[in-house]
Amino acid sequence: MAWLRKKEQQSDPLTPWQQYQARQQQTPRHDRRQKPKLDVNLPKIQTLRRRKLVKNLVLILLPLLLLLGVFGYFASPLSKVGLVSVQGVTTVPDQQVINATKLSDDDLMLSVAFHKNAIAQRVQKSLPEIKTASLTIKGFNRIIIKTSEYQTVGYVYQKHAYHKILVTGEVLAAGTQTPVTTYPVFSGFTAKELPQMITLLKQFPAAIRRDISEIDASRGDANPNQIALNMNDGYRIIADTRTIAKKIKYYPAIVSQVKQKGVVDLEVGAFWRPYSSSEKSSND
């Protein structure tokens, strides 16, 4: 009977607590293997957190630094016009070109950068001598004005002053009492005739061009096309505007054969004659 009771007791179901204890005894090794996995993953999690923190800081600080940089730039002298220099001019003073830009040291370089073409056009409009103009920005606030000029071909005497004549035929409004002696003085030409005479003058050899002191629309001997050229070497040329471009090349050979100053007549033919009394007095 005792053996039967023991058999019955062994077949009784386990209580919940006994079941839990039995499971715990079966899984300790499995649990010990899982703990190291948690320890290995922990540094990776910390690294990811640090990266995320750095990324958030960059996203916050970068715009702030950019704003501070922009405000600092506009508050500094580097944001405004500094040194302005001119390249390419020979007859127009540099300061006159700079004044034509109407730039001041209070103007922002950013505004200059966006309006370079307009400023260049302002220079060309203010100074007829300037053929081309362009602005280049160097560094933070240095401006270089690169220019080219229309060639000066002579002067015309008007209103008690000598006014420059450009190769385009335009007569400048500004006059001077001391013209550059390397350029001839034109007189007697109409506004229509002056550009035509300039075109003829450009066809002369350079050495002869430099030796001309005056060009007069003399219109003598009933010839409306007659001109007179007074030369720096003391000779005078009488010619016709319709033929002078072809005949002017004979001038050096003619004067090389005579020792006396006089008139080189290229109007009809090509020859030398001495000054008449009236021509000599007017030439003196």
UniProtKB/Swiss-Prot annotation:
A Pfam family: POTRA_1
Segments of this protein annotated with the region Disordered: 1-38
Location in or out of the cell: Cell membrane
Extracellular face of the membrane: 78-284
Function: Cell division protein that may be involved in stabilizing or promoting the assembly of the division complex.
Family named by the database record: Belongs to the FtsQ/DivIB family. DivIB subfamily.
HAMAP family, alphabetized: DivIB
Designated name of the protein: Cell division protein DivIB
